[in-house]
């Protein structure tokens, strides 16, 4: 509907950019792609851009496995292996704090703990605060980020990048195709180092299958 309105208001050419693996409404994206010629009343040209300049080889190879039919190429830049860390709920703040310290020791300035939901981000920030640890919570009301350690939801992390990323508690809560897209978004935020944690019995089948 939005493209139809724009096309009728402004008689010009359009360039549309997007990543199907980062959409949170997969059906809407498919409908748009399949009907674009009808909406614009003319033939559209589809160009696939599949080279990333952001992440290291190890990170790209990992999220290629997570994404739906993803085959992203990368600039040849080696980095550290993707890390998987099991935690216990009663001690995970300490584990996360240790991971942050290791990231800082490697010279990573911008570090994000990425949660699945805004509520998870808020609860986790409160747990850090109760432990006497100062950490930035980026939510819908945040208008500035000081390039330090932060807690942020996947939705709010879209479009951002960080030296190091810790994806929080990738357990059985990640199971659907939309969850696969969410996980892909989280992992593609990382430039140099990516760690996934889990405080449940097993990591999500989306990453172990």
What is the meaning of each model-derived region?
Residues 1-209:
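Conserved helicase motor core of SF1/SF2 NTP-dependent helicases
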